[in-house]
Amino acid sequence: MIKTLVIGSKGFIGSHLFKSLSAQGEFEVWGSDVVYDYTSHNYFVIDASNSDFEEIFEGNQFEFCINCSGSASVPDSLIHPLRDFYLNTVNVFKLLEAIRKYSPKCKFLNISSAAVYGNPVVMLITENAALRPLSPYGQHKLQAENICMEFHMFHQLKTCSVRIFSAYGRDLKKQVFWDIAQKSIKSKKMTLFGTGEESRDFIHVDDIVYGIECILKKGEYDGAVYNLANSIEVTIADAAAELLNSLGWQGKLTFTGQLRKGDPLKWRADITRLKALGYEQKISISEGLKDYVKWLKEEKLV
């Protein structure tokens, strides 16, 4: 059994990854997060604002540690930059320092973000594109990537970072699709930020998990970075229309014409490196949004 630790195992990506790895049979999966879990023996409770990972690694030898923890809000990072820095950067350093001391053979996979790119000059966005974050969140994710490289270069730890683009899917109660769904309940008139022509490279959480597993098993751990997306550019207007159609909403959608601070204009990833590891998209944006609406209705959230 491959002993694997998922940090942030109760979060959006972490919880789906934990379930998938646990179901495969070859992994002995342990979790760690800020909430208590009285039903699981393979679980560590941590205080994210004052984390101490040394006790975890002092008593356990893991083959893999996957860091899915941290804050994932651009607006919140602008309001509370120190908190965001601690959750997204300092905790990565503390994790790697604990691994360096007690479990130096452990491979560390860090979940990063496409926010490190900001507004790219060239589309497609390769992993070698210029890194110009537009927010503290993006800057802190980039600093965490640099820390992963630091521990590889100077302490010979095996690390890599995964830059996830626009994630969505069941259990996500924030960001654009959640906001649209909640607004659809309240009114037949809806206003969204931007012009609608802004674009994203959306990826369903099931495909995110599949991509992480491809990197986990076949990726390089020399401080490498991987884009995790589908290399399909979808405008916000088209994505919103698809979701509202699945919701059965009939009303008037308008856009403010103004971007929120920290939001990029257009994203489309080059996923050549990821596809070389065997990744192929399984869930289209249309299928994924229908599944998201099904979940919203099952949970009586719309």
Q: Residue ranges of each PLM-predicted region?
A:
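Conserved beta-loop-beta element that borders a ligand/cofactor-binding pocket
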Residues: S113, E145-R170
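Conserved catalytic-site region of short-chain dehydrogenase/reductase
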Residues: V74, N110-L124, P136-L142, A167-K174
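N-terminal Rossmann NAD(P)H-binding glycine-rich loop of SDR-like oxidoreductase domains
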Residues: T4-Q24
